């Protein structure tokens, strides 16, 4: 049985390497979903006491989905969509409740879901504007196709200097150049940065833009705490590109300030769909160990990326564990988008899923603090009960 399975795998591998496959080999079966077909309904349930999505959600663990290195994957099924004409609205507020109201309305009242809704806190905006500038300019001028080559070149340069005992040379040189350049962001974005602490980028299809515009106009009419503007094409593109550049800005900050920064604690967190207190409040003892906190994320899903730039001399692992405790109190799920890796403890349902996929524990043993022993010993057996119920229902 094992030999025949290996032979099938080698046959698949050889066919892929030789390009010996075609359209006739792809099964267009509607029950073979690339994503959860119920998610649109799920995310609209803004009063639910559970997160909209997180990596270890038992109802969405299936084959490659959530496999975390426990399978040898030759191909995966992905959804594709025609590119829609869209409009971007840029919202700013000093009251988080404003954005909560916007989120709840747009998710429940629009005939179609928004295409995207990205949150940026002012601190993340500032760090991204300065320390993500080179990423922004690279993509803005040359497109995403050049990014892999640029990062490969940077890695080679860093490797050369690290052999000489010098770390982060390219980051510091690039940052010195970027610091001499003027702001690359549109004027209205910079104005909103000065006026408002919380920023929300909303992209909607053109057929829902009138309803969105009407709601935002009525909601912010006479409201001192917030305002919005409708982006032109260039502003909308640059707003979302800025959001993308923020994701790597904390790492650049660390490399540019080696004398003051110890490390970065990076969390991705799924909050409850009905959580109105989504702005994190840290105790003073944790605040004292942090230089900057970067909050940004997928606001309509209530999934946030939280990057903490930790002071030199502070134990980042101890800080992270303390933050886990706070997230547990808030009934959040984490990691939201990343796998547990060898840092987080896999919950029983996830550990059982790993055992289903890899009964011999050959691939990536020990992930999620599970057993490293062949055959799993006594780990995870009780929770390995077959595919999650949700997907058995979908399969019909």
What annotation goes with each model-predicted range?
Residues 10-11, 118-119, 123, 130-131:
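Active-site loops and adjacent core secondary-structure elements that bind or stabilize anionic groups
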Residues 18-67, 74-76:
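Conserved mixed alpha/beta core segments that line enzyme active sites in large multi-domain catalysts
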Residues 80-87:
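Flexible, low-complexity linker/loop segments at domain and module junctions
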Residues 165-396:
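Conserved glycine-rich FAD pyrophosphate-binding loop
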């Amino acid at each position: 049985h094992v030999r025949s399975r290996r032979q099938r795998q080698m046959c698949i591998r050889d066919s892929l390497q030789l390009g010996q496959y075609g359209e006739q080999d792809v099964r267009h079966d509607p029950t073979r979903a690339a994503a959860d077909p119920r998610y649109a309904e799920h995310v609209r349930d803004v009063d639910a006491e559970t997160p909209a999505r997180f990596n270890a959600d038992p109802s969405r663990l299936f084959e490659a989905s959530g496999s975390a290195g426990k399978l040898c994957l030759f191909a995966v099924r992905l959804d594709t969509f025609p590119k829609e004409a869209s409009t971007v609205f840029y919202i700013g507020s000093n009251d988080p409740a404003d954005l909560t109201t916007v989120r709840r309305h747009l998710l429940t009242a629009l005939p179609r879901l928004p295409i995207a809704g990205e949150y940026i806190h002012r601190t993340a905006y500032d760090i991204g504007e300065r320390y993500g500038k080179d990423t922004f300019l690279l993509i803005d001028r040359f497109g995403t196709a050049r990014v892999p080559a640029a990062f490969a070149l940077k890695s080679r340069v860093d490797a050369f200097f690290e052999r000489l005992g010098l770390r982060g040379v390219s980051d510091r040189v690039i940052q010195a150049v970027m610091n001499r350049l003027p702001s690359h962001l549109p004027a209205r974005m910079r104005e909103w940065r000065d006026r408002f602490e919380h920023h929300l980028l909303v992209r909607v299809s053109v057929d829902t833009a009138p309803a969105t515009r009407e709601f935002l106009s009525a909601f912010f009419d006479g409201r001192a705490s917030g305002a919005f503007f409708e982006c032109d094409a260039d502003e909308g593109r640059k707003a979302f590109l800025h959001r993308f550049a923020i994701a790597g800005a904390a790492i650049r900050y660390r490399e540019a300030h080696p004398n003051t920064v110890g490390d970065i604690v990076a969390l991705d967190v799924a909050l409850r769909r009905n959580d109105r207190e989504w702005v994190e409040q840290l105790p003073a003892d944790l605040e004292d160990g942090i230089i900057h906190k970067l909050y940004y994320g997928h606001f309509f899903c209530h999934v946030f990326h939280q990057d903490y730039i930790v002071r030199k001399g502070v134990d980042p692992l101890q800080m992270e564990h303390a933050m886990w405790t706070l997230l547990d109190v808030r009934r959040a799920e984490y990691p939201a988008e990343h796998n547990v890796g060898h840092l987080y403890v896999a919950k029983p349902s996830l550990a059982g899923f790993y055992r289903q996929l890899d009964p011999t524990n050959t691939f990536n043993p020990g992930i999620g603090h599970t057993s490293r022993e062949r055959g799993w010993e006594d780990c995870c057996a009780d929770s390995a009960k077959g595919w999650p119920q949700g997907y058995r229902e979908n399969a019909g």
